[in-house]
Amino acid sequence: MALNLRKNHQILKIINDALIDLPAPSNISTWWNFGSLLGICLITQIVTGLLLAMHYTADTNLAFSSVAHMCRDVQFGWLIRNLHANGASFFFICIYLHIGRGLYYGSYLNKETWNVGVILLLTLMATAFVGYVLPWGQMSFWGATVITNLFSAIPYIGQTLVEWAWGGFSVDNPTLTRFFALHFLLPFVIVGLTLVHLTFLHETGSNNPLGIPSDCDKIPFHPYYTIKDILGFVLMLSLLVSLALFSPNLLGDPENFTPANPLVTPPHIKPEWYFLFAYAILRSIPNKLGGVLALAASILVLFLTPLLHTSKLRSMTFRPLSQILFWTLVANVLILTWVGSQPVEHPFIIIGQLASFTYFTIILVLFPLAAALENKLLKL
């Protein structure tokens, strides 16, 4: 009998075990689509980014003009740029929904997968930040100045660290050059981490909405989840193309259409929308080092979630108190996002401080307490 190449060839076997014959729970919902959507986002960003890099010039005198030239004179350059800029937004929408799914259904109990995922989030944030600097508009320049300056809050080595990152005494040509190099490199680091993420995931298998073992009822990934993922791809890419064609600048800052000028500070420096919640937490603490620590903690707190799981049930499906807290946390993050886009004045300062306090309280205190209470109420 002839060997089945798909199951015996060294390389095809890996693909087969990950995408075709992978045993998957029979009841995973659309919330499990976002992992594959993130993969498509990554591929889209690498392809469009590579095409943009072919026309971009990483020099302070030419960067802004090279981006304008791309949009005017390169075949479909405007489309490639708009897909790349808005693709970043979709990347973050998908990753936040993916993390939300993980928190709700207790997927963080696959500790290795979860920890690699948090590292992936941090790498993605770094990539998006250095990428935003490249067009060398006003918000690019001032965003780079403000955020890199935060490292100067680190005691003793802070100022040296910042000047080392800048390659001089201010954000200038060396900074832009190294940011371009990093922006080119980091997506490939993300690809590597994604493979590690998947390797750990396939050790344990996927979680499911009930949060119970699903070994007794598994179905092959292909054709069931391949077709389901393709539907997700079509829907997300349709939305991305629609945004890029109809309203490409909806999520951008008009300030970035002005070339960078170190002598003119924009009236309100703010990052892209997907960083606003963390920016609001940073701003809500009146001390520089305290703000930087809170900013770091807002993401690093995700590493603690597996340790703070006190419930005897994995998922929140049967835990109404935790559900209320979860949706309060979601609303809270949306409030932080809105506050981050507002000027630093009353009442936004106090709203931001309350929302920041609530963010950490829900994750670090209320989630474990509610879960322990539910154990009692459900007599577990």
From Swiss-Prot:
Tell me yes or no: is Iron among this UniProt entry's keywords.
yes
- Answer yes or no on keyword 4Fe-4S: no
A single Gene Ontology CC annotation of this entry is: mitochondrial inner membrane
Domain of life where this protein originates: Eukaryota
The record's section on Pfam families has: Cytochrom_B_C, Cytochrome_B
Q: What is its main location?
A: mitochondrion
Tell me how this protein sits in the membrane.
Answer: Multi-pass membrane protein
Q: Please name the GO terms of the biological process aspect recorded for this protein, alphabetically.
A: mitochondrial electron transport, ubiquinol to cytochrome c
Q: Where is it located?
A: Mitochondrion inner membrane
| Segments traversing the membrane | 34-54, 78-99, 114-134, 179-199, 227-247, 289-309, 321-341, 348-368
Q: Which InterPro entries match?
A: Cyt_b/b6_C, Cyt_b/b6_C_sf, Cyt_b/b6_N, Cytb/b6-like_sf, Cytochrome_b, Cytochrome_b_C_euk/bac, Cytochrome_b_N_euk/bac, Di-haem_cyt_TM
- UniProt binding sites for heme b b562: H84, H183
Q: Which cofactor does it need?
A: heme b
A GO term for molecular function: metal ion binding
The UniProt annotation places a ubiquinone binding at H202
User: Which residues are noted in the entry as heme b b566-binding?
Assistant: H98, H197
The entry's free-text remark on the cofactor is: Binds 2 heme b groups non-covalently.
Any idea which UniProt keywords this protein has? Electron transport, Heme, Iron, Membrane, Metal-binding, Mitochondrion, Mitochondrion inner membrane, Respiratory chain, Transmembrane, Transmembrane helix, Transport, Ubiquinone
Quaternary structure, per UniProt, is: The cytochrome bc1 complex contains 11 subunits: 3 respiratory subunits (MT-CYB, CYC1 and UQCRFS1), 2 core proteins (UQCRC1 and UQCRC2) and 6 low-molecular weight proteins (UQCRH/QCR6, UQCRB/QCR7, UQCRQ/QCR8, UQCR10/QCR9, UQCR11/QCR10 and a cleavage product of UQCRFS1). This cytochrome bc1 complex then forms a dimer.
Family classification: Belongs to the cytochrome b family.
Q: What does this protein do?
A: Component of the ubiquinol-cytochrome c reductase complex (complex III or cytochrome b-c1 complex) that is part of the mitochondrial respiratory chain. The b-c1 complex mediates electron transfer from ubiquinol to cytochrome c. Contributes to the generation of a proton gradient across the mitochondrial membrane that is then used for ATP synthesis.
Q: Extra notes? A: Heme 1 (or BL or b562) is low-potential and absorbs at about 562 nm, and heme 2 (or BH or b566) is high-potential and absorbs at about 566 nm.
Name-wise, this protein is: Cytochrome b
What is the organism field in this record? Answer: Oreothlypis gutturalis
Chain's gene name? MT-CYB
